[in-house]
From Swiss-Prot:
Cross-referenced InterPro entries: DUF1846, DUF1846_C, DUF1846_N
Gene3D superfamilies associated with the record: dip2346 domain like, Domain of unknown function (DUF1846), C-terminal subdomain
One Pfam family per UniProt: DUF1846_C
Entry similarity comment: Belongs to the UPF0371 family.
The protein, known as: UPF0371 protein CLK_3516
Listed transmembrane segments: none
Length: 502
């Protein structure tokens, strides 16, 4: 893989800049936007970026940092899903706490924002408290977003309980956007000043990157990733007016800045040190880019990937038509098309051949996989196994120089599994999934040296690109994710069945 980003340089630059910012205050509330862990978007658009860079940065500052996690009560009620992991936001909070503890980072508490006694939220609160985790409940702020006098009063932020913290940097994070991070920071700021403490607020958001051009593919890829939020990148007019320098920010931050500035000034009783929303940020990711062309190409591929993802989400009913069309429009505005993703044409062409050969209207799943050396392999679904499983077996055979004619998995192993699924468990679809085939392969590897060699090649699939001609099941997507394979799908179901699709 060609590298476009220097991870070590970025970590050094970023930690230094955060420490410089905290020197101005007794306590700094640092709003962490985006993903704290497993930032797969950043990893894809910035080749060389460590997906866990942010948490490693915090680990470096662990003596000075504690963490507050925000969760919007409405997201618990409607079981909002974190798309890249396929888990709900409340479950992601539990995962996040475990991961933070794994990096020796102190989790202060969980804040439930816009709380109004929702039943599912109360169950989640009980679950946390009975595991010894502090929980604070913040109701919707009276007067928000325009009535600054009410917001900054005992009727507004004053109604929220004060969260006791002990360290100079308080990171406020969440599973996703709209979780109430900013409101929590400002509420704390209000309480700190009421107690006579000098506290500050800053924002750490990786995208958009303020010091690369507005129409750079890296920033356009961010628009594509947040198409459901309708985020639009813009020139920060406040920054230009203050410093006569061009900086990129996004519409929500620019639109809310005048009110945010007034709130901070009302809390502190003095003029804000921030002249623009860009000033509030501490992001140094742009300084880690070492090969702009590599980053541009990776970002273009991400824009195509996002268009596929949004099309599938539209088909499933998760996003509206406007979101679907906007993702497509962003791709077209960059003069990109679906076929610019190398694995798309081989998958579609093979699927068309199979359909013609079978002379049936049924859709056949074909999965194409591009290996690190540029080789593109395909696998198709059959009565025996899914297309995802077939292409993985073909890939490990390729890496291990094993002939196509050699069976890696003995029929003695496969037949009992299929019988179990069909006869004992009563499954409608008996074809083995990718995970089931990998388990069968691992069993064979115990007695078959060839299968053992093939098993050893699985780590080589990390970072590979794949495309499926039909929508994959959640299980198949998760197996590919665990293997480190980025997969896209055509927005087509494998059959007309509504429940027994995958």
């Amino acid at each position: 893989m060609r590298i476009g980003f220097d991870h070590e340089k970025y970590l050094e630059e970023q930690s230094k800049y955060i420490l410089e910012r905290v020197n101005n205050y007794d306590k700094l509330y640092l709003e962490f936007g985006g993903k704290l862990l497993f930032d797969l978007h950043a990893k894809r658009v910035l080749p060389g970026f460590d997906e866990n860079a942010k948490i490693k940065l915090l680990h470096k500052l662990k003596e000075k940092v504690e963490i507050i996690i925000c969760l919007y009560a409405g997201d618990i009620e409607r079981n909002k899903i974190r798309g890249d992991f396929g888990i709900t936001y409340d479950v992601d909070v539990l995962r996040l706490i475990d991961d933070l503890r794994g990096y020796d980072l102190e989790v202060n508490s969980v804040v439930i924002t816009r709380y109004s006694g929702q039943p599912a939220t109360n169950i989640f609160i009980n679950k946390l408290e009975r595991r010894g985790i502090k929980v604070y409940k913040h109701e919707a702020t009276k007067g928000y977003p325009t009535d600054v006098d009410t917001i900054v009063s005992d009727e507004g932020y004053g109604k929220n309980p004060y969260i006791e913290t002990t360290k100079p940097i308080v990171v406020v994070t969440a599973p996703g956007p709209g979780s109430g991070k900013l409101a929590t920071c400002l509420s704390q700021l209000y309480h700190e000043y009421k107690r006579g403490n000098v506290a500050g607020y800053s924002k750490f958001e990786t995208f958009p990157v303020w010091n690369v051009p507005l129409k750079h593919p890296l920033n356009i890829a961010y628009e594509s990733a947040t198409v459901d939020l309708k985020d639009v990148n813009m020139i920060d007019s406040f920054h230009f007016d203050a410093y006569n320098k061009v900086a990129v920010n996004y519409n929500r931050d620019i639109e809310s800045f005048p009110v945010l500035k007034r709130i901070i000034e009302k809390i502190t009783g003095e003029e804000s040190v921030y002249k623009s929303p860009t000033d509030m940020g501490v992001n140094r990711v742009g300084f880690g880019i070492v090969d702009d062309e590599v980053v541009k190409e990776a970002s273009k591929q991400e824009i195509i990937r996002r268009a596929f993802k949004t099309a599938c989400e539209y088909k499933k009913g998760y996003v509206d038509k406007e979101t679907f069309h906007r993702a497509k429009l962003i791709m077209e505005e960059m003069n990109l098309k679906e076929e610019d993703r190398k694995v798309v044409i081989p998958a579609r062409e093979y699927a068309a051949k199979l359909k013609e050969r079978a002379n049936k209207s049924e859709t056949c799943t074909v999965v194409a996989l591009e290996l690190e050396d540029g080789t593109i392999l395909t696998g198709r679904s059959s009565e025996l196994m899914d297309g995802t499983a077939a292409v993985i077996l073909n890939a490990v055979k390729h890496y291990a120089n094993i002939s196509d004619e050699i069976h890696l998995i003995s029929p003695v192993i496969l037949e009992p599994i299929i019988n179990l699924k069909a006869k004992t468990l009563g499954s409608k679809r008996t074809a083995l999934s990718c995970e089931e085939v990998l388990i069968a392969l691992s069993i064979c590897a115990a007695t078959n040296p060839t299968a053992q060699v093939a098993m050893g090649k699985l780590p080589m699939l990390k970072g590979c690109q794949a495309h499926s001609t039909t929508i994959l099941s959640t299980n198949e997507e998760q197996t590919f994710r665990k293997l480190g394979i980025d997969v896209t799908c055509d927005p087509e179901y494998i059959s007309e069945s509504l429940y027994y699709n995958n």
